[in-house]
Amino acid sequence: MISIEKFEIFGREIWIAVFFEEKIDGVTFSLDGCEYLMERINSLKALLERRNVSVNLAEEKSDYPKIVYNVLVGDIENQDALRFLSFRGVTPFEKKVYEVLTKKVKRGSVITYGELAKMLSTSPRAVGNAMKRNPYPIIVPCHRVVLKSGLGDYTPKREYKQFLLEIEGVKGWTS
């Protein structure tokens, strides 16, 4: 099922969509309106289906979008929200990356791909690939992973990464 809700933060609308069964299978969001959210939903649906996670597009009201929003604004700690995630379709390596990132890199801070890779005894490229395939943005804070030389990319848009870091009060990585 899918639950969609619109919130406002820092004077901007944010649309949050959550795929779920008993737990969250995937999260996506848009700062560019409902139409763009539909594109993001289709991308997430494709990612989940490639991972053999069945997706039901029937809309059903749930608390999950509000939980994601509460993580975004800091009312719920990221690591406390991990319990809501199903991790269905996520590889054991990706799960480890997501858990380490979420537990070790707190709100208001960033880590480089290389630093996170060192913590996991892997390569920065492997960490980057896991971040690119993260089905749980905001809860698993892939926006907190940056290049040594600057902000780096972000799916769906680099501007979204900047916005998320600004919300968290991160200085120096958002310009």
Swiss-Prot record:
Active site: 142 (nucleophile)
Catalysed reactions, as listed in the record: a 6-O-methyl-2'-deoxyguanosine in DNA + L-cysteinyl-[protein] = S-methyl-L-cysteinyl-[protein] + a 2'-deoxyguanosine in DNA; a 4-O-methyl-thymidine in DNA + L-cysteinyl-[protein] = a thymidine in DNA + S-methyl-L-cysteinyl-[protein]
EC code: 2.1.1.63
Gene3D superfamilies: Methylated DNA-protein cysteine methyltransferase domain (3.30.160.70), Winged helix-like DNA-binding domain superfamily/Winged helix DNA-binding domain (1.10.10.10)
Protein keywords: Cytoplasm, DNA damage, DNA repair, Methyltransferase, Transferase
GO cellular component assignments: cytoplasm
EC class name: transferase
Function: Involved in the cellular defense against the biological effects of O6-methylguanine (O6-MeG) and O4-methylthymine (O4-MeT) in DNA. Repairs the methylated nucleobase in DNA by stoichiometrically transferring the methyl group to a cysteine residue in the enzyme. This is a suicide reaction: the enzyme is irreversibly inactivated.
PANTHER family per the UniProt record, alphabetical: METHYLATED-DNA--PROTEIN-CYSTEINE METHYLTRANSFERASE (PTHR46460:SF1)
Assigned protein family: Belongs to the MGMT family.
NCBIfam families: DNA_protcyst_Mta_Thcoc, ogt, PRK03887.1
Note: This enzyme catalyzes only one turnover and therefore is not strictly catalytic. According to one definition, an enzyme is a biocatalyst that acts repeatedly and over many reaction cycles.
Protein name stated in the entry: Methylated-DNA--protein-cysteine methyltransferase
Designated gene of the protein: ogt
